């Protein structure tokens, strides 16, 4: 892998990548122009990446996607006309091609970077194909839905000596990063409680897979399960999971009867501390039936160690705005995530946002790996990116939650190899 600037392939042309949402509500107010394409375009402007490609299963919507990127990116900021040169796959006349990403992979070279923001049940096949082509992969959370598939991706990444990371951008929120750095001073893990809720309009965006191929826990709880595990570190590990769900509102809102859609899911987990075998508790709640409010995502967490605690309210940053706008007269703003307001010079100025930094950091370390400056082990030791190797416990908790719900909220045990170090990842799940 020679010393050259990487190319970037984006798989999935939806809300998070391009800001394209073809519903009445449109893109969410916290990411109106998407995150991935605008970040890559700015990185290209800064000389950090070379060519850009975009693949989706539906070719017929690509003209609208390109128009969205042109309007929201190229025409809004100076120097961002590169977005108009993104090569898209499949052709515009293709109604549906689930493997169109393979056409785009063929355009890439070993060492290039790929982002995957597609429905959860498609992540595994796409990530595997990309890594087998020697491409570095950044996949949306959850990486996959089952522990078995997660462990298989670890093996594929190892065999091809490529980096595979899960895009947990909250790790780059300065408050969350600081909480993680303070974690050791709080003593052994004792308690974690997190809540994330989003408005019902999100159900319009996700109606094709909600209650079918994934659920609200995979979509939102994944964030804070990762943060909990990140702060607690490898000196604590999850051992048991029980899940509960509320239902009724989502089915009514979408007016569907062919499937049951959980409104809210709570996962209750037991953790074990290495130092003395003491126990901790993690509670993670996610919902997508909230009313429209001053913040798109209401979210907070409380982390308690045996010697201290931390509380973070991410929806209330102390930065408020009110306008004569009937659609959104009042808002709690969070430019720490993505800053879309252009700078006074007309250029995109959101380089410090943690949505941007999460992707930029991935590109940075991939470039350094390609140039022989660092190894995969170095990336693992840095700890800021969620590598596929270090994040299996998050997938295990999520799958255990689904398994619990599908079995009348029975408990699920996370099984570890007894001959492996305490810090190792779980290897299986077992109902009890």
Question: Which role does the model predict for each range below?
Answer:
Residues 14-17, 24, 163-165, 170-262, ...:
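Predominantly a Rossmann-like dinucleotide-binding segment in NAD(P)-dependent oxidoreductases
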Residues 16, 143-145:
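Short, acidic/turn-prone active-site loops that include or flank metal/cofactor-
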Residues 134, 140-142:
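Short helix/strand-capping hinge loops at secondary-structure junctions
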Residues 2-133, 151, 155-159:
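N-terminal glycine-/serine-/threonine-rich beta1-alpha1-beta2 phosphate-ribose binding loop
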Residues 4, 204, 219-326, 355-376, ...:
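Contiguous beta-strand/loop segments that form the cofactor/metal-binding neighborhood of enzyme cores
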Residues 115-116, 139, 194:
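Redox-cofactor binding/interface segments in oxidoreductases and associated redox assembly factors
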Residues 50, 54, 372-394:
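Glycine- and charged-residue-rich phosphate/anionic-cofactor binding loop of Rossmann-like
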Residues 139-140, 164-166, 312:
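Hydrophobic residues in well-ordered beta-strands that form the structural core
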């Amino acid at each position: 892998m020679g010393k050259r600037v990487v190319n970037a392939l984006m798989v999935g042309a939806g809300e998070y990548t391009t800001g394209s949402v073809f519903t009445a509500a449109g893109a969410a107010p916290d990411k109106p122009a998407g995150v991935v394409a605008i970040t890559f375009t700015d990185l290209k402007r800064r000389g950090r990446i070379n060519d850009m490609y975009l693949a989706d299963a539906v070719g017929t919507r690509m003209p609208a996607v390109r128009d969205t990127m042109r309007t929201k990116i190229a025409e809004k900021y100076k120097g961002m006309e590169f977005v108009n040169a993104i090569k898209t796959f499949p052709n515009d006349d293709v109604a549906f091609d689930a493997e169109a990403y393979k056409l785009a992979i063929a355009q890439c070279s070993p060492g290039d970077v790929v982002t995957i923001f597609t429905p959860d049940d498609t992540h595994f096949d796409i990530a595997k194909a990309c890594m087998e082509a020697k491409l570095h992969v950044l996949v949306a959370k959850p990486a996959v839905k089952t522990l078995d598939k997660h462990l298989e991706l670890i093996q594929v990444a190892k065999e091809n000596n490529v980096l595979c990371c899960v895009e947990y951008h909250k790790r780059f929120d300065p408050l969350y990063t600081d909480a993680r750095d303070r974690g050791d001073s709080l003593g052994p893990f004792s308690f974690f409680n997190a809540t994330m809720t989003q408005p019902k309009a999100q159900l319009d965006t996700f109606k094709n897979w909600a209650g079918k191929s994934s659920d609200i826990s995979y979509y939102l709880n994944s964030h804070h399960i990762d943060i909990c595990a990140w702060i607690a570190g490898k000196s604590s590990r999850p051992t048991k999971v029980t899940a509960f769900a509320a239902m009724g509102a989502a089915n009514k809102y979408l007016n569907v009867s062919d499937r049951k859609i959980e409104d809210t899911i709570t996962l209750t987990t037991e953790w074990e501390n290495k130092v003395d075998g003491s126990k901790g508790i993690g509670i993670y709640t996610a919902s997508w039936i909230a009313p429209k409010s001053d913040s798109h995502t209401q979210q907070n967490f409380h982390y308690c160690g045996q010697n201290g605690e931390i509380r973070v309210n991410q929806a209330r940053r102390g930065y408020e705005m009110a306008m004569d706008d009937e659609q959104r007269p009042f808002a709690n703003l969070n430019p720490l995530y993505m800053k879309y307001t252009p700078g006074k010079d007309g250029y995109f100025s959101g380089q410090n946002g943690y949505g941007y930094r999460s992707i930029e950091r991935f590109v940075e370390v991939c470039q350094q790996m390609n140039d022989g400056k660092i190894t995969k082990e170095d990336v693992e030791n840095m700890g800021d990116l969620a590598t596929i190797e270090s994040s299996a416990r998050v997938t295990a908790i999520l799958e255990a939650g689904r398994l619990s719900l599908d079995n009348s909220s029975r408990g699920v045990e996370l099984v570890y190899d007894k001959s492996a170090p305490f810090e190792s990842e779980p290897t299986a799940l077992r109902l009890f």
